[in-house]
């Protein structure tokens, strides 16, 4: 059942929709802008997730947010949403980018900061022999960082990847520029 067609605030009053849920065991949810914004769950989301657990289902969460790890989301779901979860329930764009880079650039030099802690050789300064450039959402983005990325891309023939194509990220007051907007600005 897609969240756009299922109104979770009526979960306990709509018998037909409840019956459809009982046959399902796997549920995939986007987080930001779908079941939550910031540290606030949308009305009915917690009830729906608890109901899924009650019927023996399993919820997985997919997000384009590359700034948080699966463990960060476990903590957020516990502390902010009062929901129990495990790290394997979260698939982030950062995690998927990491998997891609480990498979394709394990011994190469990568221009990004966040992947160093996962065993990849990364750099945040413009230097020769960079093998690829990866751009992610960056809340501390500045002109200096943009200049460094552009210098690498214009002086070296390297692939350029973004962790997600989203132009904007939903937050409590509306939207802010996301990875896709940063990538568009660079290109």
Give short role names for the model-derived ranges.
Residues 1-31, 35-187:
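HAD-like aspartate-dependent phosphatase fold
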């Amino acid at each position: 059942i897609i969240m756009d067609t299922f109104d979770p605030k009526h979960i306990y009053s709509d018998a037909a929709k409840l019956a459809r849920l009982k046959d399902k065991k796997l549920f995939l949810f986007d987080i930001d802008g779908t079941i939550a914004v910031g540290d606030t769950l949308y009305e009915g989301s917690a009830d729906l997730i608890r109901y899924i657990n009650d019927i023996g289902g399993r919820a997985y969460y997919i997000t384009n947010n590359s700034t948080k790890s699966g463990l960060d989301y476990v903590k957020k779901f516990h502390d902010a949403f009062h929901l129990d979860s495990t790290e394997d329930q979260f698939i982030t764009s950062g995690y998927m980018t990491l998997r891609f880079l480990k498979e394709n650039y394990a011994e190469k030099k990568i221009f990004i900061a966040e992947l160093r802690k996962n065993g990849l050789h990364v750099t945040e300064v413009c230097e020769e022999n960079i093998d690829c450039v990866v751009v992610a959402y960056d809340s501390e983005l500045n002109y200096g960082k943009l200049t460094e990325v552009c210098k690498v891309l214009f002086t070296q023939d390297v692939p350029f990847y973004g962790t997600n194509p989203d132009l904007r990220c939903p937050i409590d007051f509306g939207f802010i520029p996301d990875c896709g907007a940063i990538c568009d600005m660079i290109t």
